[in-house]
Every structure is written in structure tokens, then in C-alpha cells.
């Protein structure tokens, strides 16, 4: 299959298995959820009765005071005591094998092509790290909410995009399923398309 280049009167030959496969919604959902889960910090913690300091001595004797029996001031029913079912640091990451990950990325790329959300250009860069220059270039292409993918990370482009709302710049190594679906359009260079194909085969 062919992808038409936006800035040239030509087309780029690409693999049908990478850019023309059927959309697998269940797989994409599973991989995106797993990817988002892996980004969770999971470092919250509370203290149980065994973690709270103090409470070694029995507050009063077992019998004869008229008060309810008590063995420690760190009991969960006491103010300043431990928490009954305390939160513990946990790892939320889910296992996603390479075949599933690649399948999900191919599925997303194919759907972007079908929805005319993938824009391929021969090259895309700015001469200086100036936000206004990049803004003008994106206006020419009528792009506002866009992920720009280049073969290698272009520092000028990266710096120029830092202060633009809903504009992100990634190299091929930096793309992931979440970023591909987070933007309205995906602008990718021809060299990056070839590199993406190589990485997914």
C-alpha cells in the first residue's frame, strides 16, 4: 500500500501488515491500560499497628478498673493507633509481551491511516528553536493538536514545541500506544515511517 506525502507529489510504499491491518480494539485497550498502569507510582503507604511507634506497655491492668480491656495504645480503635487495612506500596505494572505490543501499535497506526489522522511528510524541521517558527509551520498544515514523529530527536524542533499546547515531538524510539491515540493528528516524516516499519517487524 502507499501513503501520500503531504509536502511532495509522490507516495511512500509501506507494508500492509503495519499500516493496513484490521483494528483490534480489545488488544489496543489491553495494551493502553497496561501502559497507563505501568506509569502509576504506587508508593502510598500507611502504618498498621505493628508499624506505629510505642504501645509496648499495657495501658491499664486487665481487670478491676471498670474500663474496657486494652492491650496497646496503638490498637486501630485508638486515636493515634495503626490503620486496620493499611495501604502498602504496590507495583501496578502489567506484563505485555512483544507480540501484543507490536500488534497494538500496528493496529493504532492502521486506524490512524483509515481516519486520515496520519500525515506523512518528506521532512519536517525548524531552523532555530523558535516556537513562533514551528507555530507558523503547523498553521500552514492546519495542525493544532498534533504528535510530531521524526527519525532521530531534532533538538530545535523539540525545544520549539515545548511551550505549545497539545503539540509533542518524539523520535521513533519515544513513541508508545498512549501517545499515538492522545493526539488528534500524527505528523510523521518519511524516514521515521521506514524506521517504524523496521522496528515492528
From Swiss-Prot:
One of its GO terms (biological process) is translation. GO terms for molecular function: rRNA binding; structural constituent of ribosome. Keywords: Ribonucleoprotein, Ribosomal protein, RNA-binding, rRNA-binding. One of its GO terms (cellular component) is ribosome. Coiled coil: none annotated. It holds the Pfam family Ribosomal_L4. Residues 43-71 are annotated as: Disordered. One of the primary rRNA binding proteins, this protein initially binds near the 5'-end of the 23S rRNA. It is important during the early stages of 50S assembly. It makes multiple contacts with different domains of the 23S rRNA in the assembled 50S subunit and ribosome. Forms part of the polypeptide exit tunnel. Part of the 50S ribosomal subunit. Belongs to the universal ribosomal protein uL4 family. This is Large ribosomal subunit protein uL4. It comes from Psychromonas ingrahamii (strain DSM 17664 / CCUG 51855 / 37). The lineage of its organism: Bacteria, Pseudomonadati, Pseudomonadota, Gammaproteobacteria, Alteromonadales.
Amino acid at each position: 500500500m502507499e501513503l501520500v506525502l503531504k509536502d511532495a507529489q509522490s507516495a511512500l510504499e509501506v507494508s500492509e501488515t503495519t499500516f493496513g491491518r484490521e483494528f483490534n480494539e480489545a488488544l489496543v485497550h489491553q495494551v493502553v491500560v497496561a501502559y497507563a498502569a505501568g506509569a502509576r507510582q504506587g508508593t502510598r503507604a500507611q502504618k498498621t499497628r505493628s508499624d506505629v511507634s510505642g504501645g509496648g506497655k499495657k495501658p491499664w491492668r486487665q481487670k478491676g478498673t471498670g474500663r474496657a480491656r486494652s492491650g496497646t495504645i496503638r490498637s486501630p480503635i485508638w486515636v493515634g493507633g495503626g490503620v486496620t487495612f493499611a495501604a502498602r506500596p504496590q507495583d501496578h505494572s502489567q506484563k505485555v509481551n512483544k507480540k501484543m505490543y507490536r500488534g497494538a501499535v500496528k493496529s493504532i497506526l492502521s486506524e490512524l491511516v483509515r481516519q486520515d489522522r496520519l500525515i506523512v511528510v518528506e521532512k519536517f524541521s525548524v531552523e532555530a528553536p523558535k516556537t513562533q517558527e514551528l507555530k507558523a509551520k503547523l498553521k500552514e498544515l492546519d495542525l493544532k493538536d498534533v504528535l510530531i514523529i521524526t527519525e532521530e530527536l531534532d533538538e530545535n524542533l523539540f525545544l520549539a514545541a515545548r511551550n505549545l499546547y497539545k503539540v509533542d515531538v518524539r523520535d521513533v524510539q519515544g513513541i508508545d500506544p498512549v501517545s499515538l491515540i492522545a493526539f488528534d493528528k500524527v505528523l510523521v516524516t518519511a524516514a521515521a515511517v521506514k524506521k517504524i516499519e523496521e522496528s515492528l517487524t
